[in-house]
Design a protein with these regions (language model features):
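Conserved histidines in hydrophobic membrane contexts and catalytic metal-binding motifs
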Residues: 1-330
Length: 330
């Protein structure tokens, strides 16, 4: 019961954010649609224009090509204010640009708690889904993520407890009585006795539906735990029972939020090296985007065609990672 409220919020928001891209385009055509005609300006040039308009901002995510008729959505991170030694408060972390004209279509704070508008409602639900918008406390931003991860662990354990409680009791030996088979005694747990009392029908619905959907419930619970507590619990546990290849992020400590790692190599240099490496691996897709994580000092270059950034079956496209200081392949 304690977990039910969390699961209701997570389930309802999860159903909505499954369509986040489609809903965002429906609600915000003024941001996502581009009307100017003509050849597209190179994305890196557009990124430089954004930084020139606001020197407090650093472009940390650059889509390298736009879908026809769509704007380009750049990810933004704040630079450090030399006067305070802390990050600037920009009030936005996304900028939408018409790729043909270079005109800025708008800015927004993805995941903002307030105000909730058509521009922010989808991202509000997205963050609510996995962190409940729990604020930063004692310099840590992950309290909400950890809380939902703990709820997922409880749910995972509850899946096994509930399954065990449906199993038939072990019968005491009775030499003169022929016992029913184990399956025949468990079979009623999978059925709903419609002729019983309201309490019995409700109990049967709860038990039967839980059994028929048990595998799905377990998968959702286990994956939620593994996503929210990946580095804290899941990866260390899996490393004990199997060989797990660490990601570049697993091998580094996260820098202090207000002391980001400044990149030394540039976007063009990293893209050039990544394209060479991708061709050596036999990848045919073009470089689709580049991002820089200033908390870890790592560049990532994804390879996909425009509009295919979710990859096959939603698992995402392949990425190559490079060190932000010396540009070496990670």
């Amino acid at each position: 019961l304690a977990a039910a409220g969390f699961l209701i919020v997570s389930g309802l928001t999860g159903a909505v954010i499954s369509w986040d891209h489609e809903l965002d385009e429906l609600l915000n055509p003024h941001l996502t649609e581009a009307v100017a005609e003509g050849p597209a300006i190179p994305s890196l040039a557009l990124a430089s224009m954004i930084e020139a308009r606001d020197p407090r901002a650093r472009v940390t995510y650059v889509p390298l090509a736009a879908e026809p008729g769509h704007s380009i959505n750049f990810g933004i991170s704040p630079r450090v204010d030399p006067a305070t030694g802390r990050l600037y408060e920009l009030g936005y972390n996304e900028v939408f640009v018409d790729p043909a004209s270079g005109r800025e279509l708008g800015r927004r704070e993805w995941g903002a708690v307030w105000p909730i508008t058509t521009e922010t409602v989808v991202s509000f639900l997205y963050v609510l889904h996995y962190s409940l918008h729990v604020p930063e406390l004692w310099g840590i931003e992950l309290w909400g993520v950890w809380l939902m991860g703990i709820v997922a662990i409880v749910w995972t354990i509850d899946c096994f407890v509930g399954f065990y409680l449906t199993l038939p009791r072990r019968l005491a030996p009775a030499p003169r009585r022929r016992a029913n088979s184990w399956w025949s005694r468990w079979k009623p747990a999978w059925q709903i006795k419609t002729g019983g009392s309201a309490y019995r029908i409700n109990f049967d619905i709860h038990r039967a539906f839980s059994l028929w959907t048990w595998v799905l419930l377990f998968i959702v619970a286990f994956t939620a735990f593994s996503l929210n507590l990946y580095s804290e619990v899941f990866h260390p546990l899996m490393s004990r029972v199997s060989e797990v290849t660490p990601t570049p992020f697993d091998q580094r400590e996260l820098a202090d939020r207000h002391q980001p790692i400044e990149p030394i190599v540039s976007f063009p240099t990293v893209i050039e090296r990544a394209v060479v490496e991708a061709r050596a691996r036999g990848w045919q897709e073009p470089a689709g985007d580049i991002n820089y994580d200033q908390g870890y000092g790592i560049f990532g270059v994804g390879f996909f065609h425009p509009g295919d950034d979710h990859g096959s079956a939603g698992v995402g496209p392949p990425y190559l990672y490079y060190d932000g200081r010396d540009g070496r392949f990670l």
